[in-house]
């Protein structure tokens, strides 16, 4: 299957009063990505194979207009707080803040207009990297503090690196992730049921029926969350355990998550295999949220194929969901003077 680069002219628009564009970066080994500053999204990710052909392994659309109207968070940066904040409120230093309710009574992925829906500033580009900046102003979606966020995409060899950097002028909460939808057979190439997934975690984060953590961490032993060995997704995805989310939409606690002395080195969190590729996910984040695209439908993608539920999978490295309500979870509050830095690597083998 032949994949074509997206025409940069189709992204040349003014949105929210700001210039949008699409930027192509390439590594020394031919890994190629197209990034737009609308939502800091990965528009395409072309992975080279041994025979020199390229496969685009992320879902997406050919025109900016289509990106502006889709509602399933394709490939962007979720923030200010990825995941749900229960009851759309939180207490920070004794003060209660109310956030936008955009998921029933809860806040999802930052509110009505999260970071995935903002036009970012392009700070720097080079042949293999792009740095994007967004200033989330005090009070945006109810969150306190002016939060500066830098996201840097860097291609090295067959690695897509994502570097996150944030600082604030008031105590606030933060959780950033990239919501890329992967199909290693290629975008538009059907279901991911034939992929295998390995999650290198001994523990998981139990959720209630609203996909909110109940507040503890449990062993994966003897549960459908035990994917320490490579597991065919088709053999696991229809387990009643995953019925509430119509498929996998669950969080694993990665090794070392509760070690207060850990400096969070990069750790191998997950291995996904499909088509001709193996993709490792390495991260400094303590949680791996896996989402099997259960609500993807009614979209026609880049190559003209209609996207159906479970035609892609997201491996979202992040802080624990709803951590602000659970003191036993790793801290999600960022304070003035603190450096908030994380890294996630998608490595293709």
Segment roles from a protein language model:
Residues 3-349:
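An exposed, glycine/acidic-rich loop-and-rim segment of catalytic or binding clefts
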């Amino acid at each position: 299957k032949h994949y074509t680069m997206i025409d940069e002219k189709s992204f040349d628009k003014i949105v929210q009063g700001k210039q949008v564009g699409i930027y192509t970066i390439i590594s020394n080994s031919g890994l190629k990505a197209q990034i737009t500053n609308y939502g800091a999204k990965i528009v395409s990710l072309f992975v080279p194979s041994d025979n020199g052909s390229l496969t685009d392994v992320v879902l997406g659309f050919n025109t900016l207009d289509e990106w502006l109207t889709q509602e399933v968070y394709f490939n962007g940066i979720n923030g200010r707080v990825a995941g749900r904040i229960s009851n759309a409120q939180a207490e920070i230093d004794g003060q209660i803040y109310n956030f936008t309710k955009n998921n029933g009574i809860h806040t999802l992925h930052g509110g009505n207009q999260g970071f995935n829906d903002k036009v970012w500033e392009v700070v720097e580009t080079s042949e293999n990297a792009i740095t994007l900046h967004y200033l989330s102003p005090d009070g945006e979606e109810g969150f306190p503090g002016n939060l500066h966020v830098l996201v840097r995409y860097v291609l090295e060899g067959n690695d897509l690196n994502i570097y996150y950097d944030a600082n604030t002028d008031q105590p606030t909460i933060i959780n950033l992730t990239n919501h890329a939808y992967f199909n290693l057979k290629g975008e538009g190439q059907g279901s991911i049921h034939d992929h295998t997934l390995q999650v290198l975690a001994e523990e998981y984060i139990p959720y209630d029926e609203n996909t909110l953590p109940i507040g503890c961490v449990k062993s994966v032993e003897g549960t459908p969350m035990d994917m320490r060995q490579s597991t065919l997704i088709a053999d696991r995805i229809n387990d009643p355990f995953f019925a509430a989310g119509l498929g996998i939409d669950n969080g694993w606690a990665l090794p070392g998550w509760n070690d207060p002395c850990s400096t969070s080195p990069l750790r191998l969190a997950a291995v996904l295999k499909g088509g001709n590729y193996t993709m490792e996910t390495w991260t400094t984040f303590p949680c791996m949220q896996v989402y099997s695209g259960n609500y993807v439908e009614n979209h026609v993608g880049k190559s003209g194929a209609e996207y159906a539920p479970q035609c892609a999978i997201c491996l979202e490295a992040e802080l624990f969901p709803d951590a602000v309500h659970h003191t036993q979870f790793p801290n999600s509050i960022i304070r003035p003077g603190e450096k908030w830095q994380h890294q996630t690597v998608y490595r293709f083998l």
